[in-house]
């Protein structure tokens, strides 16, 4: 294992060829350690098992990290040939228990493990070739090809950790111990856990875009907060300390829990931490691939809801105010005691980066100033729901890494665990999980009388998403004609008296068209390639409202709130299934429709011709296809050779409609003369962009 230990890379120093070698070494070790993780499965059959019922089978994650590289390299136009389009669809999207996540196993025909191994080898060779041949310009920034390689590497290291948690949830007889590093053998009684004072300070959070290390989008930007004086536990809460809560009826007493926590406890019928085991006499602890007698001096591993209940129990028992630290308070602790960042380590200053153990260890083993385990051992839950700092912007090639978690339901974990490597082990890392999720995570307790400060933006500030909301829903605030409503009216008039029940909308955007059509059809499946966009109609469907900010003039903005019931869409909202998928590489499950609508999507696709050539396969006999497009072809999105029209061929002009007709004519007939509908993009209170979208209607032969 030690030969695979490495650190994330300084992207500013050195010479180009040295940096290329560093990145290749980092990639190869990342790939190897990820594959080593799965050697703990007892047989290939276990790949088809789920560690958690709310996660995919393990084979998905084995394939997913390789597919991620290929899909991102395709998206970045660094490569232009896929290895296996089917794999690159079914292994593409993971699960965060969002309502657009697809966990129906009937929708997946999982391939053999050997086929995935073969795919991984091919993907590894492609990534290696890119590393060896891509231009290297220092500093490497997020617009460079090698940034995409680093994105894939750090993504794989995230899954190294999260997949280890899933393996930890498998039955013990399905795993093999001793194949992934050495677990800690130091066990004893829990130490007394004192509260130590921490002086407050004005803090500046976030990092600049010229930072020397790779970062995810949520790390950049700036946010200032004054942290007041507080006290914090010297150690992480140990198994032994948490046992007092368990023995005092902690899991049976409603008043200790938040409403969300009590609902979870009742649903799970939880009586102790998930990885604890109890027989008639003793407790034991489940590790990734083995079970050991309970190490009472190791950190307890719980979800946020359990950690919060412990704090509430302690508050009631002692008459003081206890809670979890905020993100800013955790950062204050690391600043005071000058915890070095990853590149500054000679040896990891905590149980992190797999440098010491392949398990947690005693809470009093790694000292950082007056405290212990400020980093490493297990992640530390905070009170802070994740959101973007001021200046946040998404990376264009991974636009849904962070924004789906900016919902107030994902709390930050800080500090890393024994298996946190790469970016996860850096001081600026910002990872967040649903409050009921398990990771290798525990907590320390803070004592403070200061009101809890939660930085959580309720209004959507993503510029592109907010403008899309305004385009789709802004007619509630302006006199602008709404394109989606006009298109829906035209569709309903066109298909009147036709036996249409199942509809596929291939460009859900922020949902207006789907909601307009929902009262008139049995089921609307509305897809969008971006989780940034699809989460807005999901929120409308689930909460009944969305909020967003759009530009007025200069520094002035409008704060918008769209309420679904104001549009009369509440009654039939359940007729819609919003899902995330790429129209250029759709899953096989999206078939058997009576009507498919392609609204202003062709011009956004990498290869619209592929969609047009195969769209008939997804329609029922005599099915209808309605295409709306502005034909605004742009080489940035769609290479010239993939345009269906809008060019000269043999000296003669080929319009986009003619090109589309040439492609569709084998399977479709044009039903009626196309019409133009005005499409207004509202960019500010004084700037509108007006386009004409041509709408054509086709019938399957």
PLM features per residue range, with description:
Residues 2-56, 63-67, 75-126, 130-133, ...:
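Disulfide-stabilized, aromatic/cysteine-rich ligand-recognition loop
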Residues 622-630:
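Conserved beta-strand signature within the Rossmann-like core of class I S-adenosyl-L-methionine
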Residues 584-596:
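A short acidic, Gly/Pro-enriched loop at the edge of an enzyme's catalytic core
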Residues 553, 637-674:
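Conserved Class I S-adenosyl-L-methionine
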Residues 478-500:
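Conserved alpha-helix/loop element of class I SAM-dependent methyltransferases that forms part
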Residues 539-585:
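S-adenosyl-L-methionine
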Residues 609-621:
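A short glycine-rich, Lys/Arg-flanked "PGG" loop and its adjoining helix->strand segment in the class I
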Residues 152, 156-158, 166-186, 191-215, ...:
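Functional-site microenvironments in short loops/helix caps that host divalent-cation chemistry
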């Amino acid at each position: 294992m030690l030969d695979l230990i490495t650190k994330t890379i300084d992207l500013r120093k050195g010479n180009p060829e040295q940096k290329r070698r560093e990145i290749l070494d980092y990639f190869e070790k990342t790939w190897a350690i990820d594959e080593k993780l799965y050697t703990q499965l007892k047989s290939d059959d276990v790949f088809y098992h789920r560690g958690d019922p709310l996660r995919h089978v393990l084979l998905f994650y084995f394939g997913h990290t390789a597919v991620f590289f290929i899909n991102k390299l395709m998206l970045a136009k660094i490569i232009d040939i896929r290895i296996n389009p089917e794999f690159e669809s079914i292994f593409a999207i993971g699960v965060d228990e969002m309502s657009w996540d697809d966990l129906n196993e009937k929708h997946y025909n999982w391939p053999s493990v050997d086929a995935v191994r073969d795919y991984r080898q091919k993907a590894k060779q492609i990534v290696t070739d890119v590393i060896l041949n891509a231009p290297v310009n220092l500093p490497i920034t997020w617009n460079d090809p090698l940034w995409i390689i680093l994105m894939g590497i750090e993504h794989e290291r995230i899954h190294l950790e999260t997949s280890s948690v899933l393996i930890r949830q498998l039955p013990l007889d399905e795993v093999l111990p001793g194949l992934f590093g050495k677990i800690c053998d130091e066990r004893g009684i829990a130490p007394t856990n004192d509260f130590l004072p921490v002086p407050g300070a004005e803090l500046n959070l976030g990092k600049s875009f010229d930072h020397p290390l790779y970062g995810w989008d949520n790390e950049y930007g700036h946010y200032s907060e004054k942290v007041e004086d507080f006290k914090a536990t010297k150690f992480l809460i140990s198994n032994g300390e948490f046992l007092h809560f368990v023995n005092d009826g902690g899991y049976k007493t409603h008043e200790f829990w938040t409403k969300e926590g009590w609902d979870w406890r009742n649903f799970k019928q939880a009586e102790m931490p998930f990885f604890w085991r109890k027989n008639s006499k003793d407790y034991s602890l489940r590790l990734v691939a083995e079970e050991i007698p309970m190490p009472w001096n190791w950190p307890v591993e719980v979800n946020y809801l359990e950690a919060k209940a412990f704090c509430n129990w302690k508050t009631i028992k002692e008459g003081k105010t206890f809670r979890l630290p905020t993100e800013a308070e955790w950062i204050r602790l690391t600043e005071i005691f000058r915890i070095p960042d990853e590149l500054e380590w000679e040896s990891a200053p905590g149980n992190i980066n797999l440098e010491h153990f392949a398990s947690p260890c005693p809470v009093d083993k790694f000292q950082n100033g007056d405290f212990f385990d400020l980093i490493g051992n297990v992640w530390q839950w905070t009170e802070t729901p994740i959101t973007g700092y001021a200046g946040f912007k998404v990376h264009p090639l991974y636009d849904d890494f962070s924004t789906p978690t900016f919902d107030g339901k994902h709390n930050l974990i800080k500090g890393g665990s024994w298996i946190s490597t790469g970016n996860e082990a850096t001081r600026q890392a910002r990872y967040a999980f649903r409050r009921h999720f398990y990771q290798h995570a525990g907590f320390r307790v803070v004592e403070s009388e200061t009101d809890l400060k939660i930085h959580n933006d309720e209004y959507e500030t993503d510029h592109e998403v907010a403008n899309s909301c305004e385009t789709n829903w802004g007619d509630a605030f302006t006199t602008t004609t709404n394109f989606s409503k006009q298109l829906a009216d035209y569709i309903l008039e066109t298909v009147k008296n036709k036996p249409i029940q199942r509809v596929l909308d291939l460009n859900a955007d922020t949902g207006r068209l789907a909601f307009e059509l929902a009262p008139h059809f049995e089921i609307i499946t509305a897809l969008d390639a971006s989780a940034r966009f699809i989460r807005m109609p999901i929120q409308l469907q689930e909460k009944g409202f969305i909020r967003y900010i759009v530009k007025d003039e200069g520094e002035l903005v409008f704060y918008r709130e769209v309420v679904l019931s104001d549009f009369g869409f509440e009654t039939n909202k359940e007729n819609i299934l919003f899902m995330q998928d790429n129209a250029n590489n759709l899953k096989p499950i999206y078939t058997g429709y009576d009507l498919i609508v392609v609204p202003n999507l062709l011009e956004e696709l990498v290869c619209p011709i592929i969609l047009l050539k195969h769209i008939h396969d997804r329609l029922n006999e005599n099915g209808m296809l309605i295409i709306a497009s502005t034909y605004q072809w742009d080489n940035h999105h769609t290479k010239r050779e993939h345009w269906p029209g809008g060019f000269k061929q043999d000296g003669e002009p080929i319009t986009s409609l003619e090109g589309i007709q040439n492609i569709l004519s084998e399977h479709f007939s044009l039903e009626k003369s196309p019409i133009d509908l005005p499409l207004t993009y509202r960019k500010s209170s004084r700037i509108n962009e007006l386009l004409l979208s041509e709408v054509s209607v086709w019938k399957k032969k």
